[in-house]
């Protein structure tokens, strides 16, 4: 079972992504709308974290730094902010990958699997 923590405040993106991932075989998805919600789930074991950068209560990059103190699973950022500086900062602060919104679900799935595969090596 692949466990995913999806941190996304936009209900349409969250629901669509959650539905798509749950339709894949062997996926369990836990959804969080805010950074606070994500932190409440953070002690659980996840294989990958998908996280928006713009959250209502915190910046996803700052949240990533906090999560890195005890989580070593891949963190994939998703954001409509796709300028070079934002992407570089997200990766430098602990993110493993970045996917600009709107994203294709097949590409998202491929990125999830590639990041998990890299960790399992």
PLM feature spans:
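Active-site residues of response regulator receiver
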Residues: 52, 79
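The feature encodes the CheY-like receiver
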Residues: 56, 83, 101
């Amino acid at each position: 079972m692949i466990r995913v923590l999806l941190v996304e405040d936009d209900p349409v993106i969250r629901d669509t992504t959650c539905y798509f991932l749950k339709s894949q075989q062997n996926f369990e998805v836990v959804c969080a709308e805010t950074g606070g919600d994500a932190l409440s789930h953070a002690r659980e074991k996840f294989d990958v974290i998908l996280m928006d950068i713009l959250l209502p209560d915190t910046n996803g990059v700052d949240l990533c730094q906090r999560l890195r103190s005890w989580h070593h699973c891949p963190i994939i950022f998703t954001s409509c902010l796709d300028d070079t500086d934002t992407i570089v900062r997200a990766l430098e602060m602990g993110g493993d990958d970045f996917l600009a919104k709107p994203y294709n679900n097949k590409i998202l799935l491929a990125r999830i699997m590639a990041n998990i595969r890299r960790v399992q090596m």
